[in-house]
Amino acid sequence: MYTHNMDESRIRAEQLLTLSSAGRRLSDLVSAATAPLRYEVMRHLLRVSEETMTETLEEVVELHLVRRGPDPFTYVPFDEATGEAISTSIDPERLTRLRAQIASAALRVFE
């Protein structure tokens, strides 16, 4: 059992090393959000094409960092442990900035 967990952790670490910059930003945004994050808000913040957004979502979903939320147009951390691990790895000042950016983008997108 202990060896299995080590192997799983090593594999997970290798996966995270290959994560694209957009994938990292997306997983950070979803983990920083205090509520399920809408697709439109994520795309606005990432400033990427529809195609790149789709590819980035596929990447983070496949790595079990993010999953669809209760509404099919929202996204949340894959599970509580994943969300906690990502959000605690973010500098507190950056976390505050990300949350402010999310709030501002949500207002602009849905005006």
Report residues per predicted region.
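Short secondary-structure boundary elements
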Residues: 1-111
